[in-house]
From Swiss-Prot:
This is 2,3-bisphosphoglycerate-dependent phosphoglycerate mutase. The keyword Cell membrane does not apply. Its EC number is 5.4.2.11. It comes from Mycobacterium avium (strain 104). GO terms for molecular function: phosphoglycerate mutase activity. Transmembrane segments: none annotated. Catalyzes the interconversion of 2-phosphoglycerate and 3-phosphoglycerate. HAMAP family: PGAM_GpmA. It is an enzyme of class 5 (isomerase). The active site is at residues 12, 90. PANTHER family: PHOSPHOGLYCERATE MUTASE (PTHR11931). Keywords: Gluconeogenesis, Glycolysis, Isomerase. Pathway: Carbohydrate degradation; glycolysis; pyruvate from D-glyceraldehyde 3-phosphate: step 3/5. It comes from the Bacteria.
Amino acid sequence: MGETATLVLLRHGESEWNSLNLFTGWVDVGLTDKGRAEAVRSGELLAEQGLLPDVLYTSLLRRAITTAHLALDAADRLWIPVRRSWRLNERHYGALQGLDKAETKARYGEEQFMAWRRSYDTPPPPIERGSTYSQDADPRYADIGGGPLTECLADVVVRFLPYFTDVIVPDLRSGKTVLIVAHGNSLRALVKHLDQMSDDDVVGLNIPTGIPLRYDLDARLRPLVPGGTYLDPEAAAAGAAAVASQGGG
């Protein structure tokens, strides 16, 4: 790599369950019309600022895959290599998947709700195998035994960072502009690593949907601008506030 490397992070556009305020996790829901528009706009922002990715990384979930496709189309970069991995998936919300966030908060109380939703190392109760929103029979995850039954953010860090270091970093060091289209919590895990955030500080980090976040990294892959730079700062601030109010996921 030269003196700097460029990494762009993008959370998928608004999903159907974001709109309904449901815990989503590994449940494979699509984008809303608003989410599709956010994805297109994110690609337009990349093109307008000359920030053209050479390679794309995304998860195995359609809301991220669709966002990536729409963004690359808008940026005229559909032809670049695409690499998908379950390690970029959203945090698995266990037995909370499919539940209404407001109803869950009312049932279990503010303290327990916040511990499950935002703490670094407290996972929700595990999902029951074979239940409606479990993934144990999903062929995407056959080689990992159906995937986790629940996760906290610390678990996402453990599964994502080795992939980042072993697979994505070589592309950065070779001089490629890398675009990662993923999810609120998988991106929070990566931002925690990039910005060397404490376990306590990352609790308050919210990633808005559909707005590219640019990181220029030095030779040690440390950000030249801590926290990176959103390509639409005003929309990002409003979006992060909206995520904080509903819990993300």
